[in-house]
């Protein structure tokens, strides 16, 4: 039930601002568009459809959950860029979601139709022959029914707890005495398969929940089933993780308690596979504490993860043409992995570009450092990790070899908390010193410092990355990783770790840009430098490649730079609260978004023209949470060859007119047509990595 809220003063909304939540929905629509893109291999389009749904689930859990919590506050809370109230935002989100649901359904039906010529069909019961129906009834009786537990809601059996994102069959039952009851049957079960193949028709499948729904009469023989549907709820995940630092408990125990609380938070959305009468919907809403406006009817399966089973079938039937061409990240030509890496890195900086180049080079460096007698310590910040992490294995080995290993494991990495808790235990048991994050700030930086004892004193090798230390996602996300023996960078990295060990943040830095105290101000200063250059009659230039732009202070400074005549180019994959190309405000700002085979995740900052350029790679987007509420690190790229490489990469992305979409002055995204032959930046980067690796290999063999 919504509380009566006090009104707050409205503000003037700048014409160049876009609401964060609506901008994110536009990003997810671009993901959905790839599912409908005939230029993408058919089986891969299934993946985009599943990613779209997974993204939307998390969006509702986190963002809509937060807004719904705000709606319960005593005072109206307004978003600081467009002045929308929490309620106005939720209303707009719901309408946009309903529109996108229609688009998703049309694309899904198109995909299923296009799969049929390749021998793949997903059907429901009414498309089966009588013989097939009997076969599936036998299958249901033997393989599914024994594992189902029906719940008829009554005084003796209250409405059951429904798990987040699990599928349930719901039915309205009429007893012989004329009483109406509600039945709930869990359909998500690891005991039986979800994707059931029809034995008489190769490549034809049915979802287990559809089979359960069809055979409900067998489970309720003494009742008449008046109506039935499949149901799925999405639960709020907006927990306050800062409270773990207020507890007397061990931080890990406190986080585990919060995770348990999250599983039982109120739903923020209910999805139904069929229409139900108003009375039953009202009853379900009451039991689940969901308002009716959060109920969605969908023609698409409630959980799209089954598409990966269809892909497995297509792979097994040698339908490789329906997939992306298999690609293996190449080893960087900058390092000879058959020789010791530390001496090579002491001579030159290395920039790894994932997934085009292999994270193996960095893992090899850690493994070497774990064994090298000159290495005295390894310090590292960890946010998200792969299952069976080789990086953790290297740190464990280093500790077991007597080296000092200090690891900050961020326990508050959303939806990775349990994994990080387990890794923190493993690292501690091996003798590593583990820090569980920082009170008041999430540690999101990607920083590794290897300290060596030499004849001249301590010597540092520093690695700064834009993405997580995760072998799996390094093959799926575009990221950059700088490995340098620059001693000044190493000293500043050491200061970051010294502060973290004291539960503090770095107050000032020189080469590194370190949030939350330094990064935003330094970025603003560099934008101002470009404004000053234009005022002096020189050219001003800013190039930014990030995932999201929401920081109002930075947005307003970029607008000021545009008004002064600074040329600004931005590659912003997701949320962009700045609307470019508006006369008098942002006409000198160009924004594109790239959604392609790999998830764009790298961050690049470029300031100044050639003779006075400054270039950085960073873990931080230009979001308030990154610049003000997190520990982030941006590192300068000082090597001239690597600067040129960054320039080439950025310019290639700005010229991408196959996967790159232009954000227009209307706030919508449009196709681009720049080249006679469409240019795909990710394809070019892989081709270059492959070519360089081949040339280097041949040269070494000669």
Residue spans for each PLM region:
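Glycine/threonine-rich ATP-lid/beta-loop region of ATP-binding domains
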Residues: 552-559
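Hydrophobic alpha/beta core scaffold segments
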Residues: 567-571
């Amino acid at each position: 039930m919504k509380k009566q809220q006090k009104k707050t003063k409205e503000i003037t909304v700048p014409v160049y601002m876009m609401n964060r939540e609506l901008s994110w929905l536009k990003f997810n629509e671009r993901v959905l568009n790839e599912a409908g893109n005939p230029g993408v291999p058919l089986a891969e389009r299934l993946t985009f459809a599943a990613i779209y749904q997974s993204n939307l689930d998390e969006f509702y859990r986190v963002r809509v959950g937060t807004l719904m919590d705000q709606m319960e506050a005593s005072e109206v809370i307004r978003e600081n860029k467009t002045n929308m109230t929490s309620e106005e935002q939720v209303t707009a989100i719901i309408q946009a979601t309903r529109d996108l649901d229609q688009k998703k359904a049309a694309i899904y039906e198109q995909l299923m139709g296009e799969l049929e010529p390749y021998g793949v069909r997903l059907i429901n019961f009414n498309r089966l022959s009588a013989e097939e129906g009997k076969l599936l009834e036998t299958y249901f009786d033997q393989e599914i029914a024994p594992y189902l537990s029906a719940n008829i809601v009554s005084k003796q059996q209250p409405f059951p707890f429904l798990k987040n994102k699990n599928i349930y069959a719901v039915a309205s039952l009429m007893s012989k005495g004329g009483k109406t009851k509600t039945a709930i049957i869990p359909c998500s079960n690891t005991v039986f398969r979800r994707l059931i193949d029809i034995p008489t028709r190769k490549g034809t499948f049915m979802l287990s929940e559809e089979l359960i729904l069809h055979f409900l009469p067998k489970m309720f023989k003494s009742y008449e089933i008046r109506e039935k549907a499949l149901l799925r709820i999405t639960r709020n995940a907006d927990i306050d993780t800062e409270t773990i630092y207020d507890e007397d408990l061990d931080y890990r125990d406190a986080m585990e308690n919060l995770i348990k609380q999250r599983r039982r938070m109120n739903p923020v959305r209910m999805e139904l596979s069929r229409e139900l009468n108003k009375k039953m919907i009202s009853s379900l809403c009451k039991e689940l504490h969901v308002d009716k406006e959060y109920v969605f009817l969908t023609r698409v399966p409630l959980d799209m993860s089954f598409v990966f089973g269809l892909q497995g079938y297509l792979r097994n039937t040698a339908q490789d043409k329906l997939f992306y061409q298999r690609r293996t990240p190449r080893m960087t030509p900058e390092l000879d992995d058959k020789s010791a890496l530390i001496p090579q890195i002491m001579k030159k900086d290395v920039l790894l570009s994932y997934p085009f180049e292999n994270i193996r080079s960095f893992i090899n460096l850690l493994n070497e450092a774990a064994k090298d007698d000159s290495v005295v310590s390894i310090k590292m910040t960890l946010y998200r990790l792969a299952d069976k992490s080789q990086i953790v294995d290297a740190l464990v080995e280093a500790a077991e070899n007597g080296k000092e290993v200090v690891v900050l494991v961020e326990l508050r990495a959303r939806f990775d908390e349990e994994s990080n808790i387990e890794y923190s235990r493993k690292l501690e048991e091996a003798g590593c010193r583990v820090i569980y994050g920082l009170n008041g700030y999430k540690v999101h930086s990607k920083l590794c410092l290897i300290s060596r004892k030499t004849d001249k004193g301590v010597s540092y090798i520093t690695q700064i990355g834009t993405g997580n230390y995760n072998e799996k996602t390094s093959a799926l996300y575009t990221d950059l990783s700088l490995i340098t023996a620059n001693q000044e960078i190493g000293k500043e990295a050491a200061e970051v770790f010294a502060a973290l060990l004291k539960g503090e943040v770095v107050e000032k830095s020189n080469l590194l840009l370190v949030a939350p105290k330094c990064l935003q101000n330094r970025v603003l200063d560099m934008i101002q430098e470009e404004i000053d250059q234009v005022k002096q009659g020189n050219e001003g230039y800013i190039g930014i490649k990030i995932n999201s732009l929401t920081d109002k202070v930075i947005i307003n400074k970029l607008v000021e730079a545009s008004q002064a005549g600074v040329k600004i180019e931005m590659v912003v994959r997701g949320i962009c609260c700045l609307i470019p190309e508006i006369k008098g405000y942002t006409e000198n700002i160009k924004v594109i978004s790239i959604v392609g085979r790999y998830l764009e995740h790298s961050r690049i900052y470029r300031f100044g023209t050639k003779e006075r350029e400054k270039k950085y790679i960073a873990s931080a987007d230009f979001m308030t949470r990154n610049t003000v509420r997190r520990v982030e690190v941006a590192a300068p790229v000082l090597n001239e060859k690597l600067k040129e490489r960054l320039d080439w990469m950025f310019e290639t992305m700005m010229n991408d007119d196959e996967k790159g979409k232009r954000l227009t002055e209307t706030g919508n995204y449009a196709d681009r047509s720049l080249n006679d032959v469409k240019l795909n930046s990710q394809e070019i980067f892989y081709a270059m990595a492959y070519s360089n690796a081949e040339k280097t290999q041949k040269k070494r063999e000669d």
